């Protein structure tokens, strides 16, 4: 039987470098950024959850469950992840950011294969050059470990997952897969890259 995988799209950040605009709702090629991520992820998972701390009515229009961080202090991505772990009964949870419009269409398959082959607790994606800490596949049972980490005042994702048996899933064959948008300039460059991809 195929493993059950749910996904959470993290849209809870402050997006200071985008002028404070809600990154998931910033338009790229006339569509909200998160819509690109949803399109890529939806065929790969059972359910999609959206973690958003503002504009929740707008996010709910996409037809998926929307939730805010249990702790309202903007503790970074881990706060959204730990809340998502409480909102899924799937065997695995895929975590992706809302501003990666070129996510691999085989993301879950490759991460799950790597994780199960090495009997790991979580898999982290890599573009071949560096790990992508907010693109991971993990077991929701790791929630208690993450809670203890946050309770100790820690915030950095890579510090947390380094405490566990994790594997790195390489996507060097898709170098743009995890390109994200932090500035208006990056948004323009990415829009041009996607348009080029669609024209070939």
Curated annotation (Swiss-Prot):
Annotated binding of Mg(2+), by residue: 99
GO molecular function, one term: metal ion binding
Cofactors named for this entry: Mg(2+)
Major subcellular location class: cytoplasm
Quaternary structure note: Monomer.
Domain notes: The N-terminal domain determines nucleotide recognition and specific binding, while the C-terminal domain determines the specific binding to the target protein.
Protein name per its UniProtKB record: Molybdenum cofactor guanylyltransferase
Originating organism: Shewanella pealeana (strain ATCC 700345 / ANG-SQ1)
Gene: mobA
